[in-house]
């Protein structure tokens, strides 16, 4: 059995011609505490965002709990907690899709919770958004 809870293999993120993270290989052992240190712009936040599926890597792989992260997000994410700099959301998803994820993580599976949350901030819950529920 693999002793590593998080692994990356040549993890890379490019924004156009700018490389933010280059061929990163991390091996985090179960039960250990690690930190990412570096100057501003060193790629710490980008690395964390890739580990959580918030930002897609340009290339490379992420393995969490011995499973490839890509394709297993729904099984892996409920077992992970992370706060990067400030509370956030998944920028590649709609507001309704973000609310659905956060509701499910809290065990709130009924679409009424999302509808109520949108109504609280005076946003309309449309039949279009029901497609994602």
Say what each PLM segment does.
Residues 100, 104, 111-128:
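Conserved ABC ATPase "signature" region
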Residues 52:
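Helix-to-loop junction immediately C-terminal to a conserved catalytic motif
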Residues 38-43:
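Walker A (P-loop) phosphate-binding loop of ABC-type ATPase nucleotide-binding domains
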Residues 60-71, 75-76:
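Conserved ABC transporter NBD signature motif
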Residues 18-19, 74:
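Short coil-to-beta microelement around the adenine-binding A-loop and adjacent beta1/P-loop entry
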